[in-house]
Structures are given as C-alpha cells and as structure tokens.
Amino acid sequence: MYTLARQLLFKLSPETSHDLSLDLIGAGGRLGLNGLVCKAPAKVPVSVMGLDFPNPVGLAAGLDKNGAAIDGFAQLGFGFVEIGTVTPRPQPGNPKPRIFRLPEAEAIINRMGFNNLGVDHLLSRVQAAKYQGILGINIGKNFDTPVERAVDDYLICLDKVYAHASYVTVNVSSPNTPGLRSLQFGDSLKQLLEALRQRQEDLAVRHGKRVPLAIKIAPDMSDEETVLVAQALVDSGMDAVIATNTTLSRVGVEGLAHGDEAGGLSGAPVRDKSTHIVKVLAAELAGRLPIIAVGGITEGKHAAEKIAAGASLVQLYSGFIYKGPALIRQSVDAIAALPKA
C-alpha cells in the first residue's frame, strides 16, 4: 500500500509531499488508525540512558520539526520518537526549494535551515499529544544568533523542554546553519558541554528528575576528530551520542539530477560513512557512552549492521520516506535476529 502512496506523493514537490504526509500521519494518529494499518513490530526491549525502550528503532529528528504528528508516528511502531530541531524563536528557514529527492540513490538533499515554529509552539503540541512513550526533543540555535552566543539558545531551549522530554538532543551538526558545526570542536565544544551539564544538574534538582542529554554529530570528521569528540563527551558527562547527521560529501550522487544542490545529503550514500563513525566511537567509548546510530538505513539489515558496529539504538529518516512504515518492523526483526552478545 505504501508503494502506491509513495508514487502519488512523489508526484508532488518534496516539501509539499512532506507536509501532506505529516498531515496524514497526524490525522491517522488522532483517529487511532495508524496502528490498524501497520503491523506492530516485535517487542525487543532495551534499556539505554536509563530509559526503557520497547524496541531500538526510533524516528530521527527532522521529519516532525514541530511535534505535529507525535501520536501518529508512535502508532506506526517506532520504539521512540524524536522531534525538532526546534529553536528558541520561530524562523522560516532557507528559501525554497530546499529539499531534493535523488531516488536513483535512495537519497535526499536538504538545506531546510532549522525551519520551525519555535519551542513554545512545539511544547503546546507535546502537551496535546497522548503518547506516553520515549520522546526525544532536538534543540538548536536560531539562524541569527551569533555562534559565540549559541550556548544561550541551547540553554533557553533546554530550560523549556526539560520537563517534557524523555531525553534532549543537542544538534551541533546541521550543515545548513552557518558556523554551527564549529561547535563540535575544541574549546567551543568543551564550553558548550560544560554549560549544558551544569544546567542539566540545576534542572534535575528543580524538576526532581534527570533527563539525559545526547549530542548529535556530523559524519564529516576524521577518525582523530571523532576520537576527540568522544573524549570530550565522556569528560563532560554527556549521556549519549547520536551518529550521524547529514553529510556534505556528494560521493554516490555524482552526475544525478540535483546531486550538486547545496545542503546535507542523507539516505543510502551516507550509510558507510555514518557506520564508520559509529565504529570509531564504539572503539573509543568502550561502552562508557551509548551510541544512537542514524544514516542510510534503507533495509532491515542496515539497522542490524549499525547495532553490530556498536550502536545501542537506531533511527530512521530518509529510509522511512523511501520504504515506508514496513522498514520499522524489518529493522526491529533484523536487530532481534542478531546473535546475543
């Protein structure tokens, strides 16, 4: 059924298709229909970051930036749902067109630029949702906030979402906000992590609960840079790392229509690059920090490969767009079939 739906949706512009899909998934969630249409995946419980997940396959941030369809996505069988990226103030993002499909490569290029309705609107949607499962909220900085003041934006968002999130993801790796990726390195990263960790401690006392913090990183790093990031995350007391965001590389899409568009590339071409980052992280972290893997999962076996590489959880984005809800169950089944450690 999804194959037919995809054929119809792909006749529309990518952003129109995205918005319509979000509306349909949201409506299905409100009516309780999504769970009837999709066969529920097996229960494969896993405990990560002190949280109990019904299965290790989640929705990656970016598909539901404003929390418009939380219940709908949950009913499709995701073990957890991550919404955002959200910023302190609403912002329109980059000019359209800003999403491009590359179906020959099962890939997407986007330069959305953190378009969202702001953290207050997102929280209104979270409070209206019935979902009681694991909810991640992904936070970023506004486009017009100088990079040297980015920590202020992250703290504003953290303060607001803390009481409503199961975990919070700090996005320092989108390629579509100028200067953002510089926050992944050196003193900039150290200062950001220290500020976040201190605020997390303060908020834990205020709210009587500790909400884990995850940092989402880019795939466009050397092994040495990845190791330094891993060490910084451990030293600062972060709770998880999400690997990875989209890539600036165009390997795998050379010569394709839209292959030279600016923005971040996701989908099948980023798979090996992202999985390599997971392996480097796993070797360095040695179990001290869990890894959430995202990037290029278009078949169930790819999810299992991420777990085998050292991840504890996986997330879907582009693969979900190309393959539909069936990919959730296929990924859960493939992970469940892995030999037990």
Swiss-Prot record:
- What does the record give as its pathway? Pyrimidine metabolism; UMP biosynthesis via de novo pathway; orotate from (S)-dihydroorotate (quinone route): step 1/1
Per its Swiss-Prot or TrEMBL entry, what cofactor is needed? FMN
Q: Does the keyword rRNA-binding apply?
A: no
State what protein this is by name.
Dihydroorotate dehydrogenase (quinone)
**Record-linked HAMAP family:** DHO_dh_type2 (MF_00225)
Topology relative to the membrane, per the entry?
Answer: Peripheral membrane protein
Localization terms from the record? Cell membrane
Q: Quote the catalytic residue positions.
A: S174
Which residues hold substrate?
K65, N110, R111, M112, G113, F114, N171, N176, N245, T246
State what this protein does. Answer: Catalyzes the conversion of dihydroorotate to orotate with quinone as electron acceptor.
Sorted alphabetically, the keyword list is: Cell membrane, Flavoprotein, FMN, Membrane, Oxidoreductase, Pyrimidine biosynthesis
What the entry lists under SUPFAM superfamilies is as follows: FMN-linked oxidoreductases
Its domain of life reads Bacteria
Return the GO cellular component terms, semicolon-separated: cytoplasm; plasma membrane
Give EC number(s), comma-separated.
1.3.5.2
A single Gene Ontology MF term assigned here is:
dihydroorotate dehydrogenase (quinone) activity
Family listed? Belongs to the dihydroorotate dehydrogenase family. Type 2 subfamily.
For this chain's record, the cofactor binding note is: Binds 1 FMN per subunit.
**Alphabetical list of Pfam families matching this protein:** DHO_dh (PF01180)
**GO biological process terms held by the UniProt record:** 'de novo' pyrimidine nucleobase biosynthetic process; 'de novo' UMP biosynthetic process
Fill in the subunit field for this protein.
Answer: Monomer.
Q: Does the keyword Flavoprotein apply?
A: yes
Q: Which residues bind FMN?
A: A61, G62, L63, D64, K65, T85, N138, N171, K216, T244, G267, G296, Y317, S318
Catalytic activity line of the entry: (S)-dihydroorotate + a quinone = orotate + a quinol
